[in-house]
Amino acid sequence: MAATVPSLARAEQAPLPDKPFAEHRVVLQLSDNDPRKQGLVISVANNLLKFYDPDKVAIEVVTFGPGIDLLRPDNTNRKLVESLVAQGVRFDVCLNTVDSIERETGKRPEFVPVATPVQVGVGQILTLTENGYTLVRP
Protein backbone atom coordinates (compact mmCIF):
# COMPACT_ATOMS: atom_id res chain seq x y z
CA MET A 1 0.00 0.00 0.00
CA ALA A 2 1.32 3.44 -0.93
CA ALA A 3 0.78 6.73 0.78
CA THR A 4 0.05 10.04 -0.86
CA VAL A 5 2.33 12.67 0.63
CA PRO A 6 0.59 15.66 2.26
CA SER A 7 0.83 19.06 0.66
CA LEU A 8 3.60 21.48 1.49
CA ALA A 9 1.24 23.79 3.36
CA ARG A 10 0.49 21.11 5.97
CA ALA A 11 3.96 19.68 6.43
CA GLU A 12 6.70 20.81 8.77
CA GLN A 13 10.32 19.87 9.07
CA ALA A 14 10.50 16.51 10.77
CA PRO A 15 11.66 16.57 14.38
CA LEU A 16 15.01 15.07 15.21
CA PRO A 17 14.88 11.30 15.66
CA ASP A 18 14.43 10.10 19.23
CA LYS A 19 17.62 8.10 19.74
CA PRO A 20 18.71 9.01 23.28
CA PHE A 21 21.60 6.52 23.35
CA ALA A 22 22.97 7.32 19.89
CA GLU A 23 26.67 8.09 20.02
CA HIS A 24 26.89 8.65 16.27
CA ARG A 25 24.56 10.64 14.01
CA VAL A 26 24.66 10.43 10.21
CA VAL A 27 22.53 12.01 7.52
CA LEU A 28 22.77 10.39 4.08
CA GLN A 29 21.90 12.57 1.09
CA LEU A 30 20.22 11.06 -1.97
CA SER A 31 19.50 13.54 -4.74
CA ASP A 32 19.58 11.45 -7.92
CA ASN A 33 17.76 8.34 -9.09
CA ASP A 34 20.77 6.29 -10.15
CA PRO A 35 20.01 2.72 -8.95
CA ARG A 36 23.70 2.22 -8.05
CA LYS A 37 23.61 5.26 -5.80
CA GLN A 38 20.35 4.09 -4.21
CA GLY A 39 22.01 0.75 -3.50
CA LEU A 40 25.06 2.50 -2.08
CA VAL A 41 22.96 4.59 0.32
CA ILE A 42 21.17 1.44 1.50
CA SER A 43 24.49 -0.37 1.85
CA VAL A 44 26.04 2.46 3.89
CA ALA A 45 23.03 2.50 6.23
CA ASN A 46 23.20 -1.29 6.63
CA ASN A 47 26.94 -1.22 7.27
CA LEU A 48 26.57 1.49 9.92
CA LEU A 49 23.90 -0.55 11.69
CA LYS A 50 26.20 -3.58 11.67
CA PHE A 51 29.30 -1.67 12.77
CA TYR A 52 27.52 0.18 15.58
CA ASP A 53 24.64 -1.19 17.59
CA PRO A 54 21.37 0.16 16.07
CA ASP A 55 20.72 1.95 19.38
CA LYS A 56 24.13 3.65 19.16
CA VAL A 57 23.69 5.25 15.74
CA ALA A 58 21.02 7.60 14.37
CA ILE A 59 20.71 7.41 10.59
CA GLU A 60 18.49 9.62 8.47
CA VAL A 61 18.32 9.40 4.68
CA VAL A 62 17.11 12.64 3.10
CA THR A 63 15.81 12.31 -0.46
CA PHE A 64 15.14 15.26 -2.74
CA GLY A 65 15.07 15.94 -6.47
CA PRO A 66 15.24 12.70 -8.47
CA GLY A 67 16.42 10.91 -5.30
CA ILE A 68 12.82 10.65 -4.08
CA ASP A 69 12.32 7.76 -6.52
CA LEU A 70 13.89 5.48 -3.89
CA LEU A 71 10.70 5.91 -1.84
CA ARG A 72 8.19 5.12 -4.58
CA PRO A 73 6.02 2.03 -4.00
CA ASP A 74 7.34 0.26 -7.12
CA ASN A 75 11.05 0.79 -6.35
CA THR A 76 12.97 -2.50 -6.30
CA ASN A 77 14.60 -1.47 -3.01
CA ARG A 78 11.30 -1.07 -1.16
CA LYS A 79 11.75 -4.10 1.12
CA LEU A 80 15.29 -3.00 1.99
CA VAL A 81 14.02 0.49 2.87
CA GLU A 82 11.27 -0.99 5.04
CA SER A 83 13.80 -3.28 6.74
CA LEU A 84 16.04 -0.33 7.55
CA VAL A 85 13.10 1.65 8.92
CA ALA A 86 12.26 -1.31 11.17
CA GLN A 87 15.82 -0.97 12.53
CA GLY A 88 15.38 2.74 13.28
CA VAL A 89 16.61 4.40 10.07
CA ARG A 90 14.44 7.29 8.90
CA PHE A 91 13.81 8.08 5.22
CA ASP A 92 12.67 11.62 4.39
CA VAL A 93 10.94 12.75 1.21
CA CYS A 94 11.19 16.41 0.15
CA LEU A 95 7.79 17.99 -0.39
CA ASN A 96 9.21 20.77 -2.56
CA THR A 97 10.14 18.04 -5.03
CA VAL A 98 6.75 16.35 -4.65
CA ASP A 99 4.97 19.66 -5.32
CA SER A 100 7.12 20.27 -8.41
CA ILE A 101 6.25 16.83 -9.80
CA GLU A 102 2.56 17.48 -9.18
CA ARG A 103 2.74 20.82 -10.99
CA GLU A 104 4.53 19.24 -13.95
CA THR A 105 2.42 16.08 -14.26
CA GLY A 106 -0.90 17.06 -12.71
CA LYS A 107 -0.68 14.06 -10.37
CA ARG A 108 0.68 13.86 -6.84
CA PRO A 109 3.18 10.98 -6.60
CA GLU A 110 2.73 8.20 -4.07
CA PHE A 111 5.38 6.97 -1.66
CA VAL A 112 5.89 4.07 0.70
CA PRO A 113 4.10 4.65 4.01
CA VAL A 114 7.41 4.59 5.92
CA ALA A 115 8.56 7.82 4.20
CA THR A 116 8.66 10.88 6.46
CA PRO A 117 7.59 14.05 4.61
CA VAL A 118 9.72 17.16 5.14
CA GLN A 119 9.08 20.56 3.60
CA VAL A 120 12.59 21.13 2.31
CA GLY A 121 15.05 18.27 1.95
CA VAL A 122 18.11 20.50 2.02
CA GLY A 123 16.63 22.36 4.99
CA GLN A 124 16.30 19.04 6.82
CA ILE A 125 19.96 18.29 6.09
CA LEU A 126 20.96 21.70 7.47
CA THR A 127 18.87 21.18 10.60
CA LEU A 128 20.44 17.79 11.19
CA THR A 129 24.02 18.99 10.62
CA GLU A 130 23.41 21.92 12.95
CA ASN A 131 22.38 19.35 15.57
CA GLY A 132 25.46 17.17 15.43
CA TYR A 133 24.78 14.94 12.40
CA THR A 134 27.57 14.23 9.92
CA LEU A 135 26.54 14.63 6.28
CA VAL A 136 27.57 11.77 3.98
CA ARG A 137 26.91 11.87 0.23
CA PRO A 138 27.61 8.36 -1.05
Model-inferred region functions:
Residues L8-P138:
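Secreted/extracellular ectodomain signature
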